[in-house]
Amino acid sequence: DRCVFIDDVGLPVTPEKIGIIVAKSLITPESNKVLAGVPCSMILEDEIPKIGGELIWIRVGDVFVCEELKKHNAALALEISAHFFAPGLTDFIFDDPIIFSLKLAEYLHKTGSNLSQLSRDIPSYPYEEMKFSCPDALKFKVNEYLTDFFSSKGYKVETIDGVKIWLDGGWVLLRPSNTQPVMRMFVEAMDKPGLEKIKSEFKSYFDDAVRAIS
């Protein structure tokens, strides 16, 4: 139920870039919304409006994605885990890697483009995912603590799924796993030094939250 893509020079292409490319042939005036799981790259915020789309951040998970697709009459949805949904191409709403791959191939054929060039035309930013041990009995309490803490500090906070904090030049998402005793941290920044700074700062916030609750 997933698909990953390697370009014509042997390099992997991120799900976000694939979503942007395929969206060019799926977005219509009647259905221009693109849904993305909150851990996805901020390149979507820059690139989707350029092709006439409206980006909506959503919660991770197939059930939630399908509900949001119906709610918004969206053209497509994607997750960082390489799940892609294109409801206009299938009789039912589900993540169909085969038809999405065919749609990409069709776009490349019609435009005479190669995937490596299309990928290079879209910016890339340093991105990292980490996970920290956190007992099941604590992880959701930690999430609530961090949400309150960051909100009180005046950060721009998104709480669709975990707590996502928007920063100057990047963002960080702290999200309790639904299946494991861990908290995951996703970080993206405009450059590598910025990424390392965010990682260090927000890992400390996580450690402080665990100590405060334990």
Name each region found by the language model.
Residues 6, 28-214:
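Phosphate-binding and adjacent anionic-ligand microenvironments
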